[in-house]
From Swiss-Prot:
One of its GO terms (cellular component) is plasma membrane. This is ATP synthase gamma chain. It comes from Xanthomonas campestris pv. campestris (strain ATCC 33913 / DSM 3586 / NCPPB 528 / LMG 568 / P 25). InterPro entries: ATP_synth_F1_ATPase_gsu, ATP_synth_F1_gsu, ATP_synth_F1_gsu_CS. The lineage of its organism: Bacteria, Pseudomonadati, Pseudomonadota, Gammaproteobacteria, Lysobacterales. PROSITE patterns: ATPASE_GAMMA. It is found in: Cell inner membrane. Gene3D superfamilies: 3.40.1380.10, ATP synthase, gamma subunit, helix hairpin domain. The gene is atpG.
Amino acid sequence: MAGGREIKTKIKSVQNTRKVTRALEMVSASKIRKAQERMKTSRPYAQAMKQVIGHLAQASTDYQHPFLVEREQVKRVGYIVISSDRGLAGGLNNNLFRKMLGEVRPWQDKGAEIDVVTIGQKASAFFRRIKVNMVGSVTHLGDSPHIEQLVGVIKVMLDAFTEGKVDRVYLVYNRFVNTMTQKASFEQLLPLPAAEHKVAHHDWDYLYEPDAATVLEHVMTRYIESLVYQAVLENVASEHAARMVAMKAASDNANKMIGTLQLVYNKARQAAITQEISEIVSGAAAV
């Protein structure tokens, strides 16, 4: 019954794989709750910074920070792309890269050059493979990233924008909607869109020392860093959610495969037993 032994071996192999996918699913389910908590905790800071930027920008009417000024001609575009370090997350990273390449193409058609800063091993490997000009990279941030880990690569792009080497900067990441939905997001980071630094009312009561322009100079960089950090946290939550869903689907498929193989094994065993009985009956009749 060699066929039966082969089927049993395959069933055992699929069962072992199912143990791995179930374990990964449970680990991701545990991590996603912590990732959501970190994401929600950091949101108020980013929102408060956004409001302060709006107040400062309107208070300093005679000074325009470079991060707020739209440039007439865009010769070079920079992208900060956030991905996961690990795989087994369904199409999370590939969908993000596909969206980005679609957004990049119109700029390339206009003759603009492209610079990329990557956060995450998957993005780094992808853009090296397609030979895009990478000017900075950071990987292995872990499940609890800190903003200090990001300051270096963010500074690379901010300096390039300030020095006029890059005329526009975009932030590309997976936005966490819910456990089942993660959306590839593509947002303009620099210059800040007008809606980002305008507020509806002028009824704030702030005193700026030494003046609004000086405060704006210091706050603006912190604000950009907070936006990127928030995007990283969103991407981490998206990664765990996508992996949990992917591993559940893999476990379900393994269950179906085991059921199918078990049925095939039972049929093969039944056929072998029937054959043995037939041979015994035939032998007895001959005697």
